[in-house]
């Protein structure tokens, strides 16, 4: 239970309200740098496929991935919106603003994530994410 909302067990379907409640908590954890809180959202046997990073299996590599991700970003502002739900799969639109730790430049990023939920936790996290210097033009994808 999170923020007074119970999450589905097994592979029961998720409601929009449940997904929004989870996303609100995830955003708070990312912006607050709560690595343990984020890792606790995943079961021990989780799988993470994040961008070009090799697939990570288990919470120890996941912790490393999240720690490295947050270490590069200062003044992180995150917005996550659930754009689709298919029973136990949540499709998330993710937008981030931050200052790059090494260059000091303002950055912006956009991504799409698919979370496969099990027992109220993120069993599989798949994400595509791109980032550019804030104000830079994004390349248009060829159709």
Where in this protein do the model-derived segments appear?
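Short, well-ordered alpha-helical segments enriched in acidic and aromatic residues
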Residues: 32-49
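Amphipathic alpha-helical repeat scaffolds
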Residues: 24-28
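Residues at alpha-helix boundaries and the short loops/turns that link adjacent helices
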Residues: 13, 29-32, 56
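A beta-strand edge to alpha-helix "cap/lid" segment located at domain peripheries
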Residues: 1-14, 18, 63-143
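Short solvent-exposed beta->alpha transition segments
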Residues: 47-67
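Secondary-structure boundary/capping signal
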Residues: 34, 46, 54, 74-77
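Short hydrophobic alpha-helical module
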Residues: 29, 41, 68-72
């Amino acid at each position: 239970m999170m923020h007074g909302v119970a999450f589905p067990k097994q592979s029961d379907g998720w409601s929009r309200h449940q997904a929004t409640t989870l996303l609100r908590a995830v955003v708070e954890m990312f912006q607050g740098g709560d690595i343990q809180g984020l890792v606790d959202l995943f079961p021990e046997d989780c799988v993470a496929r994040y961008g070009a990073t090799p697939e990570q299996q288990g919470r120890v590599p996941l912790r490393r991935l999240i720690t490295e991700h947050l270490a590069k970003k200062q003044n992180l502002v995150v917005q996550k919106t659930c754009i689709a739900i298919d029973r136990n799969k949540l499709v998330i639109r993710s937008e981030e603003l931050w200052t790059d730790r090494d260059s000091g430049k303002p950055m912006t990023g956009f991504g799409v994530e698919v979370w496969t939920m099990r027992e109220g936790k993120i069993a599989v996290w798949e994400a595509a994410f791109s980032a550019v210097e804030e104000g830079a033009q994004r390349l248009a994808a060829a159709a």
